[in-house]
Structure formats: structure tokens, C-alpha cells
């Protein structure tokens, strides 16, 4: 979670984890590096990437490219979530709920990075089970993908937005 930088198209990039891995062969061990990154525009678009290479910069670059290719749109509501959501991936489960203005991002580790680049400013979040960064990122993105805006719900049910919101 070291750096965040702006780039062309105003995408925010965050490095979540770099890990050294090894492959054991007859002549010894071959070391390589993995990098986990998230990319977002700060306005509801977010993606993650996982890259692997013999050198750290190459692994980060691969991860950033994959993150830019795998972006999703998230329907935010004034810098917070539409409603409480749950996400899961393998052993990781996350719970996120909207928070009032001024609360900030109350989330740990990898989940915080995803929410920051997605453009969420106020949220209460908790990770349960495995806290493996890759699985937490996937679970967070799963939860954000499953979130519906009132417009989406109204379209699915064939009702007006006012009926859905109870106004």
C-alpha cells in the first residue's frame, strides 16, 4: 500500500502487495515476484490486477495493465455505498455499509485501497475469515459489483424510483 500516483486519464493506481515467490528446480530455487494492484478513477470505476515477473518493476507494470483492462463500474451515492453489501471470495468475506458524511473510510488493509480508488469517501467495512490480500480484494469487488442503485432496482421491478425509495 505504498504509493498512489495520477496518470493520463486521471486514474489512481495503488500497489497493495509485493511478494517474493520461488520455484524449486534441480539446480536450486528460481525467485520471482508477484504484485497486487488496484486502479480507479475516483468516481465509481475500479479494477484490480495481479502480475508476476522476475523483477519487481515488471511485476508491478503487468499488474497495473491487468487492472486497467479489468475495470468495473460501481454506482455510488454521494461518496458512499447505496446500501449494505456483502462480498465473498474463497475464504474471505467482507461486509460494507454506507456511512454518513465525515465518517471516512473505516476499512483495513487491501479493502481500504480498493474503496479509496473507487471513489468511496464514507464507509464502514469489515473483513471476516481469510485476510489474504488477493481474496479480500476480490471479495470487495464482488460486493461492489452486487450493489444496486435505486434506478437499477426500479428498472428490474418495473416501478418508478420514487416507489422504490418510498417517497
Curated annotation (Swiss-Prot):
UniProt-listed InterPro entries: Ribosomal_Su5_D2-typ_SF (IPR020568), Ribosomal_uS5 (IPR000851), Ribosomal_uS5_bac-type (IPR005712), Ribosomal_uS5_C (IPR005324), Ribosomal_uS5_N (IPR013810), Ribosomal_uS5_N_CS (IPR018192), Ribsml_uS5_D2-typ_fold_subgr (IPR014721)
Positions of disulphide bridges: none
Lipid metabolism is among the record's keywords: no
The keyword Ubl conjugation belongs to this UniProt entry's keyword annotation: no
Pfam families: Ribosomal_S5, Ribosomal_S5_C
Protein's GO biological process: translation
Gene3D superfamilies attached to this UniProt entry: 3.30.160.20, 3.30.230.10
Domain free text: The N-terminal domain interacts with the head of the 30S subunit; the C-terminal domain interacts with the body and contacts protein S4. The interaction surface between S4 and S5 is involved in control of translational fidelity.
PANTHER family assigned: MITOCHONDRIAL RIBOSOMAL PROTEIN S5
UniProt name for this protein: Small ribosomal subunit protein uS5
Organism, as annotated: Shigella dysenteriae serotype 1 (strain Sd197)
